[in-house]
């Protein structure tokens, strides 16, 4: 299986021939190598509603007639205010089967809203992490989150092949907490740091994360690079 990193928290993969993207922050992101005008996707998974994750979901969903998977509140917002036709609302603890595999949403400690041009934020449900099971592999995208001990419970229930974990600090875990989460709680086969160096407030050296992780393998990916397993 091949999973591609495209800056911030954007991940692309294919499962059973279907094209899936997570948190498509493309336009306005000079760390992303994708073109939202030409990208083809069948499914879009959203961890939460902040602009650097919500990103280009409306453009991608409407142009591709893609199905958007995320919190029930977020899906209601997309269908009511942006005319997105294909939405699948879920919540923490829920699992659903799709033709690329299964998606289960798990807890994340963060917030979730979208701020309109007038400065008014819209509540978009709970932030969530994602467990994807596809082609016999298990992927844990933690979403934006702080450290919490139930990461161990999540990994006990779903032994993780690849974990995408934020290291940027300020808004999410930094290197110290992220490496602790990997070493003590999640213990994946492969760890990939995300959500760093997109903005000055989240500048980090991923090599420090790699040095701190003592479990499995750490792969530091540049935008456009992939992990295969």
Swiss-Prot record:
It comes from the Bacteria. Pfam families: Lactamase_B_2. Gene3D superfamilies: Ribonuclease Z/Hydroxyacylglutathione hydrolase-like (3.60.15.10). SMART domains: Lactamase_B. Keywords: Hydrolase. The keyword Hydrolase applies. The keyword Hydrolase applies. GO terms for molecular function: hydrolase activity. Belongs to the UPF0173 family. This is UPF0173 metal-dependent hydrolase SERP1270. It comes from Staphylococcus epidermidis (strain ATCC 35984 / DSM 28319 / BCRC 17069 / CCUG 31568 / BM 3577 / RP62A).
């Amino acid at each position: 299986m091949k999973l591609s990193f495209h800056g911030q928290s954007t991940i692309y993969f294919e499962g059973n021939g279907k094209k899936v993207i997570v948190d498509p922050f493309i336009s306005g992101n000079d760390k992303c190598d994708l073109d939202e005008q030409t990208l083809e996707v069948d499914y879009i998974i959203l961890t939460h509603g902040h602009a650097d994750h919500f990103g280009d979901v409306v453009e991608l969903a409407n142009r591709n007639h893609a199905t958007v998977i995320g919190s029930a509140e977020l899906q209601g917002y997309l269908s009511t205010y942006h005319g997105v036709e294909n939405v699948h609302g879920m919540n923490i603890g829920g699992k659903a089967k799709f033709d690329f595999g299964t998606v289960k949403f798990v807890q994340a400690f963060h917030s979730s809203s979208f701020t309109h041009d007038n400065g008014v934020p819209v509540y978009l449900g709970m932030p969530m992490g994602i467990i994807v099971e596809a082609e016999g592999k298990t992927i844990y995208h933690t979403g934006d989150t702080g450290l919490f001990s139930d990461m161990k419970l999540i990994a006990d229930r779903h032994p993780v092949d690849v974990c995408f974990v934020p290291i940027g600090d300020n808004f999410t875990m930094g290197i110290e907490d992220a490496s602790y989460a990997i070493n003590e709680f999640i213990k994946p086969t492969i760890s990939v740091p995300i959500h760093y160096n997109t903005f000055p407030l989240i500048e980090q050296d991923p090599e420090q994360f790699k040095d701190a992780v003592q479990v499995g393998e750490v792969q530091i990916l540049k935008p456009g690079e992939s992990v295969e397993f």
